[in-house]
Amino acid sequence: MNQDILHRYLFDNADVRGELVQLQESYQQVLDAQAYPPVLQILLGELMAATSLLTATLKFSGDISVQLQGNGPVSLAVINGNNLQQLRGVARWNGELTDNASLADLFGQGYMVITLTPDEGERYQGVVALDKPTLAACVEEYFNQSEQLPTALWLFANGQQAAGMFLQILPSQEDHHQDFEHLSQLTSTIKAEELFTLDAENVLHRLYHQEEVRLFDPIEVSFKCTCSRERSAAAIKTLEQAEVEAILAEEGKIEMGCEYCNANYVFDGIDITTIFANGQNSNIPQ
């Protein structure tokens, strides 16, 4: 089965919506960029699944960023995405990390920043502390603060595959909290191995075979990095020309590497002259 897909579903007998995401190739492309320790491989998988699930709730075209920061050995873990379910991510850390490290062990006094940037309209940013035992619980707290709608998440990753499930009450005149609690209890019986090996139809049948579930068409999830030679040139142009020329004189070239995908962009003296002489970077040789 395709291992990089997201499904939305609705319960016809309750105002509750759900999502299920299963990732493999796109997850591996994120991990391939750096030699991440096992605990960060799992964290990035959970964060990637969470970002995909969050992205599927957006009602606009635009971008999303889910960023974890702190003063611990892991200074940053971030997944960026858009409404097309195109994701990329990276983490930065210092020293050795134990396989069973908690969020607090990794980030110290940490927090999560979720930034929504519509193609049209105002940007929204929400911040919650990383003071819960799991990433899923921290994302649930974000929804409690921002949308005030009961929300539940389940996130799994093992370094090879990542997956997640999402439930949320729909705005309604009626009280469906009891339905939500019932469906949450059913969903809580899911096992990571089931999400890694079963397709969406079988997962939903396994969990909700006594419920009326409407499953919508799958949405492909993919890895997509937004780096380019032009963007790298634009970054060089923001630096002092004398500083760039000093590096060029010493190294013979300027190299710009992308930590998201490992792409490497090299600029020689002619390129640098063009960058600073021309406001349009599109003329830089490829």
UniProtKB/Swiss-Prot annotation:
Sections of the chain in a coiled coil: none
GO cellular component, one term: cytoplasm
Localization, UniProt: Cytoplasm
Chief localisation class: cytoplasm
Origin: domain of life: Bacteria
Disulfide bonds: C225-C227, C258-C261
GO molecular function list: protein folding chaperone; unfolded protein binding
UniProt name for this protein: 33 kDa chaperonin
Protein species of origin: Shewanella sp. (strain W3-18-1)
Organism lineage: Bacteria, Pseudomonadati, Pseudomonadota, Gammaproteobacteria, Alteromonadales
Name of the encoding gene: hslO
